[in-house]
Amino acid sequence: IKYFNKNKSSRLPLVKIEDSPRFSYRGFMLDISRHFYPKDKIIEVLDILSLLKLNYFELRLTDDEGWRIEIPGLPELTTVGANRGYTVNERDKLIPAYGSGAHGTKNGNGYLSKKDFKEILVYANNLGIKVIP
């Protein structure tokens, strides 16, 4: 139907659509601990989940491969845990993993601020999607 809205010359026949989900739990998991995606990409994912009528979104924020959420009072979690590159002792960043490269490129680096995470939660809730961090 979205396609037809963009194409003004298209018409739909008069129909009645009855639709209901077969399963009560319809979910998707995005693991940003292993490969970071910024807030705008997560919002795009939520829009797609809404179109597909999924109602649960597991957002993996932490694991051995990365820490992706700001925690006030513990800045070292993001200053070290949200960055990858060559390191001897992992005091300033984590070892390269999952395509991030050994030279400290920005690929795979980053974290969600407290504000970003709240905006994601509100946006998902408005779409009827429950976020499981």
Where are these regions (language model features)?
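Feature activates predominantly on carbohydrate-active enzymes
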Residues: I1-P133
